[in-house]
A protein has these predicted regions:
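Ribokinase/PfkB-type carbohydrate-kinase core domain
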Residues: 1-10, 56, 72-86, 98-172
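Glycine-rich phosphate/adenosyl-contacting loop at the front of the ribokinase-like
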Residues: 1-60, 65-68
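Residues at the start of alpha-helices and the adjacent loop-to-helix junctions
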Residues: 33-37, 88, 140
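Positions that flank functional sites
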Residues: 63, 89, 163
Length: 172
């Protein structure tokens, strides 16, 4: 199976179910809470793996506890994390997500700190049958989509706003 190279963001989401979304500078109590994997690319890679496909994820993480949680969770889901870049001293991305009784949500995201901006490592990916890139890391998306064009395989963009329109150039 050729599989899919997925390039982009991987995070941990701390999800809190609340009666109403926070609106005042005070403490709120959650009805329930859970810690789940998140991020456009990571979610796509998990979906591919759960459907029986091969997913190789290229994402940028710190060498911190959050990064370790992300890699362990993705590994349990069957995602190949060999391309995940762990930067010494960097901090991985995570979010607090509040979901009210109507299903509306608020997300507070920490995008990470000190993560590598280098994209050359993406070219070390094994040849795959398709490439999916999210726009939360536009430089990585551009590099991954160029690789898809080089391989002659579909390049798909998960274009979550805000995005750099230049990332769409390599999509097919």
């Amino acid at each position: 199976m050729a599989g899919v190279l997925v390039i982009g963001v991987a995070v941990v989401d701390f999800v809190f179910a609340v009666d109403t979304l926070p609106s005042q500078p005070t403490k709120y109590r959650a009805q329930t809470a859970e810690i789940v994997g998140g991020g456009c690319a990571a979610n796509a890679a998990v979906a591919i793996a759960r459907l029986g496909g091969r997913a190789v994820l290229g994402a940028r993480l710190g060498d911190d506890a959050i990064g370790e949680m992300i890699v362990e969770d993705l590994g349990r889901e069957g995602v190949d994390c060999a391309l995940v870049q762990r930067t010494s001293g960097a901090r991985s991305s995570f979010s607090s997500v509040y979901v009210d009784n109507a299903g509306e949500r608020q997300i507070m995201n920490f995008r990470g700190q000190g993560l590598t901006s280098e994209t050359a490592w993406i070219a070390q990916a094994p040849r795959m049958g398709a490439v999916l890139a999210d726009t939360r890391w536009s430089e990585g998306a551009k590099r991954a989509l160029a690789l898809a064009a080089e391989w002659g395989v579909p390049g798909v963009v998960d274009a979550e706003a805000p995005m750099d329109p230049a990332a769409l150039v390599g999509a097919s």
